[in-house]
Design a protein with these regions (language model features):
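Short, Lys/Arg-enriched N-terminal segments with co-localized hydrophobic residues
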Residues: 1-6
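C-terminal helix-cap and adjacent tail motif
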Residues: 9-19, 24, 93, 157-184
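Short amphipathic alpha-helical segments
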Residues: 32-37
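Small-aliphatic-rich amphipathic alpha-helix that forms the alpha element of a beta-alpha
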Residues: 39, 85, 103-147
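Glycine/small-residue-rich phosphate/adenosyl-binding loop
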Residues: 47-115
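Short secondary-structure junction motifs
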Residues: 48-51, 131, 157
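A glycine-rich helix N-cap at a beta->alpha junction
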Residues: 75-84, 149-171
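Short secondary-structure boundary segments
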Residues: 89, 138, 164
């Protein structure tokens, strides 16, 4: 759907920003479905594909989240975004053996690891499609879980505001490769 906007991977990664101000234009459902289709290719533990997405457009649900379940700085972002994605993961599949025991010392932390990979892939696919995103991690998990009526086997991993950017911030500073890379 967005062939005219295609960019290479490096350009997509280097130009993506966390967007906190959005235009009011709605997001076409076909476009969102294309982004989700791309994000579905995120790597996951034993290809478990545990991430699920709930697209929230209903103003009464958005208002409830803003007024009751997020701090003001996140509520201000959600207020402007035409859509909010509640990203969940299916519990008990990543990092586990069939008998329910942990495969590694990391235990069930692989669930959030896989959710993080999927969130990044979702945000990069949205950026390539001309949309902006910001991942939010501070919210009332119990309240949002009850409000959105998640299945019992799912857990909220992130809220992602998404829409057409109304700002284009500069890149923040980055650490040098020398600070990030060690050879042994």
């Amino acid at each position: 759907i967005w062939e005219e906007n295609e960019m290479n991977t490096t350009e997509c990664i280097r130009t993506r920003r966390s967007i906190r101000k959005f235009k009011p234009d709605p997001i076409d459902h076909f476009l969102l479905e294309s982004i989700i289709s791309t994000a579905s290719y995120s790597p996951s533990w034993k290809n478990s594909q545990i991430v699920r997405y709930i697209a929230i457009e209903d103003s009464s649900i958005l208002n409830s989240i803003m007024n009751n379940y997020t701090p003001d700085f996140n509520s201000n972002i959600i207020r402007q975004a035409p859509m909010l994605i509640a990203m969940t993961f299916v519990k008990g599949r990543c990092g586990f053996e069939r008998d329910g025991s942990f495969t590694t010392k990391k235990g069930d932390r692989w669930q959030m690891f896989d959710a993080g990979i999927a969130a990044q892939t979702f945000c990069l696919a949205a950026h390539e499609a001309g949309l902006g995103t910001v991942i939010m991690g501070i919210w009332d998990e119990d309240g949002i879980t009850k409000l959105l009526d998640f299945p019992k086997d799912q857990e909220l991993a992130a809220l992602i505001a998404i829409g057409y950017p109304d700002i284009h911030p500069d890149a923040p500073g980055r650490k040098s490769v020398d600070e990030l890379l060690t050879y042994r």
